[in-house]
Amino acid sequence: MQSSAKKVALPAMTLAALGVVFGDIGTSPLYAFAQTFTSAHVNISEATVFGILSLIFWCITLSISFKYVSIVMRADNNGEGGIMSLLALLLRIKQLDSNKKIYLIALGFVGASLFFGDGIITPAISVLSAIEGLSIATPAFDRWLIPIGLGILTALFMVQRHGTATMGKFFGPITMLWFISIGALGLYSIIQTPHILWFINPIWAIEFAIHQPFVAFVAMGSVVLTMTGGEALYADMGHFGRMPIRLAWFIVVCPSLMLNYAGQGALLLRDPQAVSNPFYLLVPEWALFPMIGLATAAAVIASQAVITGVFSMVNQAIQLRYLPRLTVIHTSDVEQGQIYVPFINWVLYISVFFLIILFESSSNLASAYGVAVTMTMLCVTILISVLAYGAWGWPWWKVTLFAVPFLALDGIFVASTSLKILSGGWVPFVIGVVVFTILMTWKRGREIVFNRLETDALPISLFIKSIGSSAETHFVPGDAVFLTGNPNIVPHAMLHNIKHNKVLHSRNIMVTVYTEDIPYVAKEQRVQLEKMDEHFYRISMYYGFKDQPNIPQALEQAYQALDLEFDMMQISFFISRDRLIHTVGDGMSPWREKLFISMQRNTSPVSDFYQIPPNRVVEMGSQIEI
């Protein structure tokens, strides 16, 4: 029965993966092939068409089919993938000292920052390239393309707060129809010009690079557009598993993409003028409007997948303490991964809106797109090479055989796309720098605050002894919960409570929340308890980086384990609200300190983040100089 269930589940999961994982790379044929010719000013001939098709085929084969599907997807963190999971795996390597880990964290932050930039560009370029088919139908639509695109994307971002669980059921079938359609269009064109299939021979790519080296180099900056979204295979592994994603790639996605690219190449051999929009010029006139509708649906699905990916990455970064607390809303009672981050949603929407106004067309946006993709691929190659050597036990020669060719290939991609910096490539670069600065500043700022608190801290063991020997200590009925980052020192809120209220509660519970480097922690492993004396308890709560912390829920579990009666109305949560003050010192540069203080002031309340009832919270203020 279990085997039968797995057989039924595998096709269903594979279909679902199509709608989430492959939307981005699946819409690349709308613009990537044409952009390769126009950006590099390639003269259309049999040699150049075959050469570029061969480059596309072998780059996809090496970078996606081999590197991502065969190698990178092995790096699963309890089934989860993505740059944050990869970073968590790397930080477990015992041979790495703290200095090397800092460099790896920085590199992981670079990859995460660029993915955020990708989340801004993908919706804009996908939707614009889809609706540009309307201009093929009639030039009258030209002036309406931007308003239509903005309208579609506005609706997409507005619906995020309600969740996409209902619509998500249709993503897989729609994307399957999309891949079947683009594959069929390509096949029909190939039948008319069958010798186009010789592009599979790598000699065409080699000869193109030898005879026109600079043109081939520039073209590589657009060839990479055929691989945009390839990182989603790894990032979404936790949702669907390795096998469904691999099956979808090799059986449906890769064949459909290559058929369509070959079909576009065959069309150019028959009609070089079709380079203006070879994708839509493949479509028969009677099918043009249905295809535009299907392409728009596929583009919206691709955009949704990237938006969801950004939400997930931001949530993981918050749980791992790499970002300040933000409001995270769960939009589904069934699926834990269905979340909505309001602040990030509006940042994405405003950024996408201005991108469309600024660049106006998908061909202009393509210049901005490649930079983020290539640098992310380079970061992943470096990180996975370190993991293979340090954690998988690969010998140095095996790591070298993997790393050198892919570092060279990714290096060529980065160098080629860097030519686009002035014409639009600065956009993801600026976005990446801003996000990277925020990540590093928050991480460093938290370290400084933590060190300041520990410098003036009082060990909890000494405090309990002094309380026990003092006749002046007054205890009042009820339970007090104090959140603390270090369970071995007295929480600031407790000291302030004694200072101002002159009392302690009959039960004082110090709670420390830990985020593990695994996605989920089982309920039975959630809490660890220690009774220090009759008035003091220490509770450690453990969550994975994809769990949503719920302190009252975990506290009830702890009370049951201690055989205590749990009554939320008898519990007060004392939280220290730190007021940071900028000082001249060895911390951070003044502008970074001001940035950190601003982020600290605008974090969402601790009670919201840990799902503590606001009417049970007592905030105790304190000042910390940084």
From Swiss-Prot:
Keywords: Cell inner membrane, Cell membrane, Ion transport, Membrane, Potassium, Potassium transport, Symport, Transmembrane, Transmembrane helix, Transport. Its main location: membrane. The chain crosses the membrane at residues 8-28, 44-64, 102-122, 139-159, 171-191, 196-216, 217-237, 249-269, 281-301, 339-359, 377-397, 399-419, 421-441. Pfam families: K_trans, K_trans_C. InterPro entries: K+_transporter, K_trans_C, K_trans_N, Kup. It catalyses: K(+)(in) + H(+)(in) = K(+)(out) + H(+)(out). One of its GO terms (cellular component) is plasma membrane. PANTHER family: LOW AFFINITY POTASSIUM TRANSPORT SYSTEM PROTEIN KUP, OSMOTIC STRESS POTASSIUM TRANSPORTER. Transport of potassium into the cell. Likely operates as a K(+):H(+) symporter. This is Probable potassium transport system protein Kup. The lineage of its organism: Bacteria, Pseudomonadati, Pseudomonadota, Gammaproteobacteria, Moraxellales. The gene is kup.
